[in-house]
């Protein structure tokens, strides 16, 4: 049997593509454009795993398909190379993070090239390259000039082990850091913030303009968290103080029986009575140690302390005790709430715990047993009694505005983006703080502000980054003799990834971020493929920066990414014991088709789980490429199932994909190729071209491969293969298995040219139509024969054919035919006696 030698074929074609710059981005202005973007990777020390190529293969198939369809294709790759892991490694080993990063990039690039992706490497970007981050810094200076980057003393999520503050989005639900899983505490610090809140409404509205999964849009909508309601002002009894509360349910104001301020609220100390001062101070101290997520956990026990003061409910004059509690956050809304315990679960639990009044103001439920959180007509609410929710809200807002104690208000859950990091390995923030108290941005002519090389990269522990120790870089003097210090905080890893897709369009421009005409030509990105874990952070930040650049006239579109696709996760083979605990693969043996724990002998259940070093089930693509070839890996990952599904890795599936490619190789290299078309494959060939074209366009790669298999099976039944069909088939499979595609194309054409730009095959609609149909012949209601006849025969012709059939004649010999019922294209029923 003939098998192809992937170890010879794949490196040969990779060298050909590199030497000939086969995938250089097209510049023919008369052609349509197609911009296919992968989420660029962080080049970790571990290298690529088999999950990376799944998304990369999808965009590569689309890119190869669109090139063959006559598009200019921009399909680039680069490196999101700043970030904590390289710095952590450098601190642990004493090595330079830049060297470590460069080694990792070289390894990633080697692995990516071994998989045959059609990237235009002339456009490679690296976020740690000063020629790249010059423009990251330039964008920051524009944000600063527009008042969208500002300094503030804010309570931050401080991670002692990382020596830095992290953004809200980087804190996990259990109150630990996304990176490393370390404890997060709240600590007030001077920080750079970006005013993403100024764009909240546009970030929300423009989601309607993009073709993204609805689940991702919903995650962004929830994160932005738009609420329409009212601000209500409460006076503090026997003082000249007051505070404002935002509520989405101003109609329940008659049921507000107490108020809660965040422990950090500016009013707390001023209204706390002497006998409550110690308890309040203690509580504030404890609250400062908890993260926002830990504080707002619905399941946690409710805690709080009374300030000793009362607020006056403006609608009925009732006194309401003012408490502080950590479930109210200073950073959310106004940092104060009015509690309506009859109709809010959290308020109800708090009221029960501290024996506070519960007054129902909506009909329905038993508020002694539980909060009633559904809608009902208003009761115990004076001028709102008998009204429904919408009418009551409108009437209460009208009353608040007329009385001067409130107004209609829209708020957002979205907070400004905490942008500074107290670390070394990031873009320096291009700001100078002068001794006269002013601050200025570094002028464009002095950008990039290059990160200085230093051995001392440990966090200072003072809240400043290690750059505070690099004196000759840190200290500057103005022409007028005024001394200054450079900003020592660096940017987060999200900075470089918020605009990299723009730099690919014009990566070597030294005068500007990118040429306006080129941006007009290529934006927006046509397809962006990556993991759903970036739903909020990266995608929201990139959309924000893009909108700022749109307002500056730099980019011509409101949105960066027209279509987004999230590939699923490739799960590893793993095993569970009877307790549900996962068992590492090196502790498992297979006997008679079952799996057993090597140490305990217990029978285990196979259960796919996320690949991890601890389970020893990480599959390295290098090993797969060596054993089976890159084309096999590509075809297998696309054939596993729908691209957006999470599916377990299977060695058997991999072997199946390799066997299929061997069959393809044999079909083209051993079958007699002829210039004469017998017509036998007309229908299946044209069906295959149509199906593969449509399914690749819709990213249904698994069904496209299934159709290619149908063609191979049909072609193998014939003695000869029509040369046009052989070539067309090789073109169809080439985006999936590009090395094999090139090799077989040369076997058929000996052109010496790549298959990449050969026009995509077309199909003949008339050949898709069946000219023959199968009909059944029934005698006494039982099927006695099946006949293939020309389509659309008349009743008379059908009857004639049926009665002439040998089997039918044998059945009716010597019998009387009572009647014959013929249904064209379906059946002939013969009634005899």
UniProtKB/Swiss-Prot annotation:
Q: Entry's PROSITE patterns?
A: AA_TRNA_LIGASE_I
A molecular function GO annotation: ATP binding
Q: Give the subcellular location.
A: Cytoplasm
- Pfam families to which the protein is assigned, alphabetical: Anticodon_1, tRNA-synt_1, tRNA-synt_1_2, tRNA-synt_1g
Family, per entry: Belongs to the class-I aminoacyl-tRNA synthetase family.
Residues bound to ATP are 613
Its cellular-component GO annotations read: cytosol
User: Where is the motif named 'HIGH' region mapped on this chain?
Assistant: 41-52
Any idea what this protein is called? Leucine--tRNA ligase
Predominant location of this chain?
A: cytoplasm
Cross-referenced SUPFAM superfamilies, in alphabetical order? Anticodon-binding domain of a subclass of class I aminoacyl-tRNA synthetases (SSF47323), Nucleotidylyl transferase (SSF52374), ValRS/IleRS/LeuRS editing domain (SSF50677)
**UniProt keyword list:** Aminoacyl-tRNA synthetase, ATP-binding, Cytoplasm, Ligase, Nucleotide-binding, Protein biosynthesis
Catalytic activity reads: tRNA(Leu) + L-leucine + ATP = L-leucyl-tRNA(Leu) + AMP + diphosphate
Its GO biological process annotations read:
leucyl-tRNA aminoacylation
Q: What is its EC number?
A: 6.1.1.4
